[in-house]
Amino acid sequence: MHKKGSAMDQVFIRDLVARGIIGINDWEREKPQEILINIVLFADLREAGNSDNIRDGVNYRTVAKKVLAHSEAAQRHTVEALAADVARLCLEEPGVQKVRVRVEKPGAVRFSRSVGVEIERTKSELE
């Protein structure tokens, strides 16, 4: 577990692509669209590094599956709400003390690659 004063390591999931209903406009809610999600999980990974056992670390595959399932089913209106959902899911994982979540909607605004939000949350904010 993370101890006060010790450094937090980072586990990341980069460019996770979900397809889900997201948006405030009627046309955005007609069919699933691409949602791009980036996650940085902050945890003390020293024990996992020493033991070489995934049970002592953060299983990014488990996190990715939960995030994909939620993102594809949630039908949120805003990227802010989806980002908050993802942050909560991540902070439920054992050992994760802080999370940074970026949710983007590629092609949502003309002449831009994507738009979105990036948030940070800590486990203590959920307690």
Regions found by a protein language model. Name each.
Residues H2-E127:
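N-terminal, polar/charged subdomain of small-to-medium soluble alpha/beta proteins
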